[in-house]
Amino acid sequence: SAYKQKPLAVVFPENTQEVSKILAYCNQERIKVVPRGAGTGLSGGALPLMDSILLCLSKFNKIIDIDYKNKCVVVQPGVTNLSITQAVEEKGFYYAPDPSSQIACTIGGNVAENSGGVHSLKYGTTTNNLLGVEVVFMDGTISRLGGKTYDSEGYDLLGLITGSEGLL
């Protein structure tokens, strides 16, 4: 990339509470935050700004649960698409919104960009394959949107977050 900015700092939180504290501090001090997964996106959403903190989520790389009966996988945002597919392929499943960068790209980046690939025509993009997320807002508030069922009452806040490129 021709864009070469160094952020104020790069942080590697290891849990949601650390992310919450970092965001609350940055919000209070009016410091910009750029979330980053694997950095494979082409829109520039994960490029640091010189007056920002780069929030690297690469340590959030665990598959939490695989529920074959309900066709649901719970993962942290740093898990790669390929890791999800490899974890479920023995039962004939795969992660359908498969961008060409699936070897390196992470599910967190997919959510931020609403990514998709060749199977998206049939199965939809990330937003069509996502049941829920845990988000941390700039004030440090931790919230869960969605759940283990596709349809829920009220506004589609999950759809609003998906594809927001970390801006919300």
Name every feature range the model reports, one short phrase each.
Residues K62-L168:
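FAD-binding subdomain of flavoenzyme oxidoreductases
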Residues S1-F60:
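Glycine-rich N-terminal segment of FAD-binding domains in flavoprotein oxidoreductases
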